[in-house]
């Protein structure tokens, strides 16, 4: 495979690609290249995928935990086929359940800062999923969901919309790791408004710095 990562030309044989291979989904294959991960779209993709214009816009935005495109990837003919992102070593995401809940809340605050940065650049986060969460003692969102640039909306409204999406993600995905029953989920819904300030509401309920995420959620669903 012959590709350009930004201005750098790579001629990768099958053996090298096998060595670099990390994972794949319905729309793309992921390879590790140095400190970066290369997301290369499959030829036939039936899902919506990030277009070149949006990827280029995102590559100019600086975030801490939401991993955005760095360089555009093209084939020999100059066609857009993907992009590079920072590579993150990860542990199983369920490990977050064993950490002190205040650590999770601190991580959420950092992600909220990234959401503010994206919102200030008119970037709307359309979807978040647990498969996009990377955990290595810190929480990262690896290429989360889909993005839309909505310059016709005010950045404040985009921020509120993005935080609502983030709040739903915390409820439906992070808490899902505990395999909560339907009744327990209803209890959580009564306790929290999963809108734009989920982290602050959760922080008010923390008993001490040593309480783990698992203990906290179980306590809140009694």
Feature names for model-found ranges:
Residues 1-12, 45-51, 205-222:
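Regulatory N- and C-terminal appendages and interdomain linkers associated
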Residues 2-4, 14-73, 96-97:
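ATP-binding glycine-rich loop module of kinase domains
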Residues 32, 87, 134-135:
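Conserved hydrophobic "DFG−1" position in protein kinase catalytic cores
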Residues 94-135, 139-140:
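Conserved kinase catalytic-core helix
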Residues 136-222:
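C-lobe/activation-segment region of protein kinase-like
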């Amino acid at each position: 495979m012959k590709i350009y990562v930004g201005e750098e030309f790579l001629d990768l044989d099958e053996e090298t690609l096998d060595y670099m291979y990390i994972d794949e989904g319905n729309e793309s294959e992921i390879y590790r290249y140095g400190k970066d991960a290369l997301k290369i779209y499959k030829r036939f993709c039936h899902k919506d995928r990030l277009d070149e214009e949006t990827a280029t816009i995102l590559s100019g935005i600086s975030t801490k935990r939401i991993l955005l495109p760095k360089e555009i990837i093209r084939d020999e003919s100059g066609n857009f086929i993907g992009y590079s992102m920072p590579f993150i070593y990860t542990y199983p995401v369920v490990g977050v359940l064993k950490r002190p809940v205040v650590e999770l809340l601190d991580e959420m605050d950092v992600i909220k800062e990234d959401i503010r940065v994206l919102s200030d650049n008119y970037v709307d986060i359309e979807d978040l999923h647990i498969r996009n969460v990377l955990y290595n003692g810190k929480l990262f969102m690896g290429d989360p969901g889909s993005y839309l640039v909505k310059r016709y909306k005010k950045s404040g409204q985009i921020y509120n919309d993005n935080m609502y999406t983030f709040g739903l993600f915390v409820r439906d995905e992070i808490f899902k790791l505990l395999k909560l029953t339907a009744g327990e989920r209803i209890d959580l819904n009564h306790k929290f408004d999963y809108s734009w300030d989920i982290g602050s509401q959760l922080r008010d309920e923390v008993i001490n710095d040593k309480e783990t995420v698992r203990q906290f959620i179980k306590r809140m669903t009694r």
